[in-house]
């Protein structure tokens, strides 16, 4: 019953989102929602139009409702399901700025003696320093500031809050594009116990046809301090993202802002040290 309630939450939010977007489309051009959406469209028109990858946080500014599901297999061959995976609502409230309001993931364990529960609340802010669409330089540079609050229960979260500053860049050539992010996790307290993590993710994408985006990611974490001091883990992540499929059209048949994007892939461990062996990643999004 608990899992069913968790899965129903994104569906309820999505239904409310569809109603809001429909109201915006039916309202006049001078309404608040219409002006807001026009500003968002202008902001996104000044950047590349690649699809958001499976794992890497895109340097592009996006406005969407997103939910992910991850099944990890740990070194003891036990499965861990992570429902929603800390995704949620992404908004572009101002020019060059995106804010992400994420719901805490629900973590379910195969092991009977390990308690299931919600993880930590996370948040993220983006500022786009530079953006150029496909008709010009087809490139982007963005800074992130992420963070987490220790709201997790039953050992499914951290003991302390943390901040994660990140720099993200991307460059495209016709149907091919590369993006990379580099950042570090900085505990607000208890740094000696938690240590620090350097996160480096890169992705190569190819736009095959109208909706298909095959990709290959490299996701790396380097540990400094704590019990894993000096260790590193790296995953290769092949995947496929399909989108954006338009769900609305205007009177002239032009696609509206509301769309559907979904995809799947698998993280495959490349290093001897790893906190989990591999993971299946599923994503669903409603850009609006």
Residue map of PLM features:
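Cleavable N-terminal export/targeting peptides
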Residues: 1-35
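Transmembrane beta-barrel domains of Gram-negative outer membranes and organellar outer membranes
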Residues: 25-288
């Amino acid at each position: 019953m608990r899992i069913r309630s968790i899965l129903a939450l994104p569906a309820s939010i999505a239904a409310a989102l569809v109603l809001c977007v429909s109201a915006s489309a039916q309202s006049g051009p001078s309404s608040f929602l219409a002006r807001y959406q026009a500003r968002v469209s202008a902001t996104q028109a000044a950047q590349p139009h690649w699809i958001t990858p499976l794992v890497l946080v895109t340097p592009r500014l996006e406005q969407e409702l997103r939910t992910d599901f991850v099944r990890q297999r740990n070194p003891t061959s036990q499965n861990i399901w992570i429902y929603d995976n800390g995704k949620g609502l992404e908004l572009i409230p101002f020019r060059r700025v995106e804010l992400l309001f994420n719901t805490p993931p629900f973590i379910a364990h195969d092991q009977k003696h390990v308690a299931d529960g919600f993880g930590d609340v996370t948040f993220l802010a983006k500022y786009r320093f530079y953006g150029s669409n496909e008709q010009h330089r087809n490139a982007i540079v963005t800074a992130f500031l992420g963070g987490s609050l220790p709201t997790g229960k039953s050992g499914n979260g951290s003991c302390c809050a943390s901040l994660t500053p990140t720099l993200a860049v991307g460059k495209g050539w016709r149907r091919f594009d590369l993006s990379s992010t580099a950042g570090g996790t900085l505990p607000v307290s208890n740094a000696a116990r938690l240590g620090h993590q350097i996160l480096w993710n890169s992705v190569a994408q190819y736009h095959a046809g109208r909706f298909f985006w095959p990709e290959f990611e490299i996701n790396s974490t380097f540990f400094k301090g704590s019990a894993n001091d000096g260790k590193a883990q790296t995953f290769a992540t092949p995947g496929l993202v399909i989108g954006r499929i338009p769900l609305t059209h205007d009177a002239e048949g032009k696609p509206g802002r509301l769309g559907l994007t979904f995809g799947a892939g698998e993280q495959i461990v490349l290093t001897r040290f790893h906190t989990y062996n591999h993971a299946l990643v599923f994503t669903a999004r409603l850009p609006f």
